[in-house]
């Protein structure tokens, strides 16, 4: 089981490394085509829109035919998408490249489902999902640093490298990842309508609060992430290399938090519910510090936001996976990805429009949404305490 876990985590790491290489460079690459900041955010949204449509279907497909074939297909599509993006000579081709990747964006969801499959209990499940976050953090630690260096060759070169890494990952996954879904339901009917699984999930009273908090978190965090490179360029004069270093620093703190602190500190001393509430407040505070545009406070906010957002991802996902029926875990986690993708559709458009009015406004939006989420979580904790009694 330990070997399976390491193999899945390595697959995630290679995938995120490719993404980490290009994410700080992407706004500068797109603007070299003469695109506006709003067009940059629309590119993020195009990926997310198609991920919103495909994620529940791919998750359900992995419940039906297994995790491994869906994972291989998804990573192969990522490679094709990055190659199209790198070879683009027009804004239209840039959109096509992101759409291809978005339409098959099931790799992260399926990897999560595979780790949930081999988890032994609630604590192990949250810790395993935290390790995925740690892999994500390492990818974002190394990727932007590599991307910053590669961008000195040309703005398109990092995207060729990302496509090459995804191609290697297809081979790695095909040869080393074995099937973890022992409860495949080949008789289940699949629907390509993305609203069908969302409607089913919305009927589940236990899951609804988690879905709402997930959307609020998604819109808040993605609004800031989308305009991050543009904001630090305006506020502090940072270019692509310095922006890559900031993303790398965030990756260091995310990896340390998810790989060590989550299991050995946070989950050891706090319940998942309390940890979710606390990290929501920390995320809100970090956005306030960023909005002040004071460099030392901004660096502090990088540490706080890396810890808070990574804990929230792991804890909310773990709680939802624990409530999902065994034969529907892939679909439910796919719905989580779909909701995050919906946030990625909404957030970049709104953030881009707000940024063009005043650069600090996307942070204000995030503060308001996370404040609302904290209020909802506080009420949930209070109801749980009242139900438990003295």
Give short role names for the model-derived ranges.
Residues 20, 48-56, 106, 140-141, ...:
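Residue-level signature of mid-helix packing/kink "hotspots" within the transmembrane helices
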Residues 24-38, 226-242:
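Short amphipathic helix-loop junctions that connect adjacent transmembrane helices
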Residues 52-89:
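Conserved MFS/SLC helix-loop-helix module at the cytosolic interface between two early adjacent transmembrane helices
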Residues 55-66, 257-271, 355:
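Helix-to-loop junctions at the C-terminal end of transmembrane segments
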Residues 97-138:
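Cytoplasmic helix-loop-helix junction between adjacent transmembrane helices
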Residues 178-212:
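Juxtamembrane intracellular "pre-TM" segments in multi-pass secondary transporters
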Residues 271-316:
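C-terminal transmembrane helical hairpin of 12-TM major facilitator-type secondary transporters
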